[in-house]
From Swiss-Prot:
Protein name as annotated: G-protein-signaling modulator 3
Pfam families noted in UniProt: GoLoco
PANTHER family: G-PROTEIN SIGNALING MODULATOR 3, G-PROTEIN-SIGNALING MODULATOR 3
UniProt organism field: Rattus norvegicus (Rat)
Pro residues bias: start-end ranges: 33-42, 86-96
Length: 158
């Protein structure tokens, strides 16, 4: 165990947990990194002193926690509040007559489709020589003969 060292004048005391570590952030996590262990023999010494894997993982955690906290704060700042205006009942729109509107739409579509189908229809083509046959019949029967065969409509006595 390390002996507690006295605080220097330039240091500020940070809140610590029961194991002597500063809190990572205000949210509780179900996991924590292990405290740094003394470096094994043959460990590299850097300008900042010996580095252990658990110390690096703690520093990485602290950095990631800072990044996550900054990003969540930034997201909260960008969040917009949405309030729906209250409409007085006198200005509220009347409920539409959905069934009648659907029936009207259906009948309109149906009539337009029927008109399109009728417009696309054409008379069937006459068989070869059919036109000549019709002209011959009209000539033989004569235009006046057809009129002679017509009957007069009955007269109404109302």
């Amino acid at each position: 165990m390390e002996a507690e060292r006295p605080q220097e004048d330039g240091e500020q005391s940070l809140p610590q947990d029961d194991q002597g570590w500063p809190p990572v952030n205000s949210t509780a996590r179900p996991w924590r990194s292990a405290p740094p262990s003394p470096p094994p023999p043959g460990t590299r010494h850097t300008a900042l002193g010996p580095r252990s894997g658990s110390l690096l993982s703690l520093q990485t955690e602290l950095l990631l926690d800072l990044v996550a906290e900054a990003q969540s704060r930034r997201l909260e700042e960008q969040r917009a509040a949405f309030h729906t205006p209250k409409v007085p009942p006198s200005l509220a729109p009347t409920p539409p007559r959905l069934l009648e509107d659907k029936e009207q739409l259906y009948s309109t579509i149906l009539s337009h489709q029927c008109q399109r189908i009728e417009a696309q229809r054409s008379d069937p083509p006459l068989p070869p020589g059919g036109q000549e046959l019709l002209e011959l019949l009209l000539r033989v029967q004569g235009g006046g003969r057809m009129e002679d065969q017509r009957s007069r409509p009955p007269t109404h006595t109302c």
